[in-house]
């Protein structure tokens, strides 16, 4: 399949682009410069023959997927394809739905997360999550960031102060908020709230960060700041991001998995997915023919 096939579909791309965006296939991926070869990276998550049901609804079907550490992995696909269900399975949040049942394995650092010996609390400490809508607690910025560390037994004020600064710096928002730490987080803008939520996740020092449509409720400027932050965070963390925004997936991710009807339809380097996909359905989706 020639690259020109996708580039020529600019009219179809309008379903997924805003008028200031470049066509997907021509987006430059500056974050991929000096890329470490995949062969030198460890597998952080390995999903093996995973099936998941909500009652009678077969939401995930025979998922096999290896996710590399210190990568940004994008999960894309039309509504209802299973992408949000999948990342919520990665930290067992799907189990909050009473009717859920699973078959198969998800290995996190070579250990099956569904094993009875695997602590859900420890898993969710290692695997943080940022949701679609910013969800700060109705507390001060300081109390939002220190909530997790306090639950884990940290009481020393000096240590907590250091965690707050480190976490807010990690979320690229320290300079904006350092003189407002006693302010209620609800008073912040949507973009600031989302970065505070990211800082709150960083405060517990996770290994993996799951992001479920983290910028869908944000304005373009705030979205850009979060995207830039994602690129910085992957130096220390493995990031898995669900997004409907094709340009965002192309800009920020190293690998992309296209989900369709509960299956992984295609999984490859992001450059290849967006310039020369192997599957016609993948091409049709990223070109705006459906979804």
From Swiss-Prot:
Keywords: ATP-binding, Cell membrane, Membrane, Nucleotide-binding, Phosphate transport, Translocase, Transport. PROSITE patterns: ABC_TRANSPORTER_1 (PS00211), ABC_TRANSPORTER_2 (PS50893), PSTB (PS51238). GO terms for cellular component: plasma membrane. Residues 45-286 form the ABC transporter domain. Its EC number is 7.3.2.1. InterPro entries: AAA+_ATPase (IPR003593), ABC_transporter-like_ATP-bd (IPR003439), ABC_transporter-like_CS (IPR017871), P-loop_NTPase (IPR027417), PstB-like (IPR005670). Its main location: membrane. One of its GO terms (biological process) is phosphate ion transmembrane transport. It is found in: Cell membrane. It comes from the Bacteria. GO terms for molecular function: ATP binding; ATP hydrolysis activity; ATPase-coupled phosphate ion transmembrane transporter activity. It is an enzyme of class 7 (translocase). The complex is composed of two ATP-binding proteins (PstB), two transmembrane proteins (PstC and PstA) and a solute-binding protein (PstS). This is Phosphate import ATP-binding protein PstB. It comes from Staphylococcus saprophyticus subsp. saprophyticus (strain ATCC 15305 / DSM 20229 / NCIMB 8711 / NCTC 7292 / S-41).
């Amino acid at each position: 399949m020639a690259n020109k096939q996708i580039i020529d579909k600019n009219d179809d791309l309008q379903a997924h682009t805003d008028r200031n965006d470049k066509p997907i296939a021509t987006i430059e991926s500056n974050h991929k410069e000096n890329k470490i070869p995949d062969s030198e990276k460890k597998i952080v998550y390995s999903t093996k023959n995973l099936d998941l049901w909500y009652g009678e609804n077969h939401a995930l079907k025979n998922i096999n997927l290896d996710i590399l550490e210190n990568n940004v992995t994008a999960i894309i696909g039309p509504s209802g394809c299973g992408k949000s269900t999948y990342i919520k399975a990665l930290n067992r949040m799907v189990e909050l739905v009473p009717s859920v049942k699973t078959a198969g394995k998800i290995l996190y650092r070579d250990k099956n997360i569904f094993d009875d010996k695997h602590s859900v609390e420890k898993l969710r400490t290692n695997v943080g999550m940022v949701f679609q809508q910013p969800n700060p607690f109705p507390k001060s910025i300081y109390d939002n960031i220190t909530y997790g560390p306090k639950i884990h037994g940290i009481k020393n004020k000096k240590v907590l102060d250091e965690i707050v600064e480190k976490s807010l710096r990690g979320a690229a928002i320290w300079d904006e908020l350092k003189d407002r730490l006693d302010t209620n987080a609800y008073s912040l803008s949507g973009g600031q709230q989302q970065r505070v939520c990211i800082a709150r996740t960083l405060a517990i020092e996770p290994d993996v960060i799951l992001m479920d449509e983290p910028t869908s409720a944000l304005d373009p400027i705030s979205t850009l700041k979060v995207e830039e932050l994602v690129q910085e965070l992957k130096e220390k963390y493995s990031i898995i991001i669900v997004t409907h925004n094709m340009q965002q997936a192309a800009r920020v991710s190293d690998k992309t998995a296209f989900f369709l009807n509960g299956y992984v339809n295609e999984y490859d380097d992001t450059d290849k997915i967006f310039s020369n996909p192997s599957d016609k359905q993948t091409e049709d989706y990223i070109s705006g023919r459906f979804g």
